[in-house]
Amino acid sequence: MTRLQNIYREQVAPVLQKEFNYKSSMQLPKLEKISLNIGLGEASQNQKLLEEAVKELTAIAGQKAVITRAKKSIASFKLREGMPIGCRVTLRGDSMWDFLDKLMNFALPRVRDFRGIADRGFDGRGNFTLGIKEHTIFPELEVDRVDNPKGMNITIVTSAKTDKEGKFLLDKLGMPFKK
């Protein structure tokens, strides 16, 4: 069991149950998965860029990244159906908890001029999406060896029914939201 899982079970779960008046511990919102996505528009022309992104995302997540392909052809983007356009990873279980711990305690504080995350990333159902401009904030990547920094989307999927429950859960776990 990871450090963050212990915090959830021992500190966050009792507070959640009290705050939202849940009758059973099975009603408590919990983390289901974390999805990491790098979208590369230039990947259709530059295969080396895509291979580099897959290698870097695999290093960040600790799990092999899957190449995403275009669902539709779009002529103005010179894109054909089935062309590679990015990569993604879905984390669950212990690797999800480890990644969230690393994100909150190591990666986000390394962002330049970091003052907290805006809470606008909630989708209405308790899930939170966060965009990162440079993926070099993660400790697994050496800034000198990365040729071109890439942006990245991180989606934290919870079993919460509302944004209020989801934000409360992430806040108690230690997500650095703006005050």
UniProtKB/Swiss-Prot annotation:
Domain of life: Bacteria
A Pfam family matched in the record: Ribosomal_L5_C
Keyword tRNA-binding set for record: yes
Keywords recorded for this protein, A-Z: Ribonucleoprotein, Ribosomal protein, RNA-binding, rRNA-binding, tRNA-binding
GO biological process, one term: translation
Subunit description: Part of the 50S ribosomal subunit; part of the 5S rRNA/L5/L18/L25 subcomplex. Contacts the 5S rRNA and the P site tRNA. Forms a bridge to the 30S subunit in the 70S ribosome.
Family membership noted in the UniProt record: Belongs to the universal ribosomal protein uL5 family.
Role according to the record: This is one of the proteins that bind and probably mediate the attachment of the 5S RNA into the large ribosomal subunit, where it forms part of the central protuberance. In the 70S ribosome it contacts protein S13 of the 30S subunit (bridge B1b), connecting the 2 subunits; this bridge is implicated in subunit movement. Contacts the P site tRNA; the 5S rRNA and some of its associated proteins might help stabilize positioning of ribosome-bound tRNAs.
NCBIfam families attached to this UniProt entry: PRK00010.1 (NF000585)
Protein name: Large ribosomal subunit protein uL5
Originating species: Oleidesulfovibrio alaskensis (strain ATCC BAA-1058 / DSM 17464 / G20)
Gene: rplE
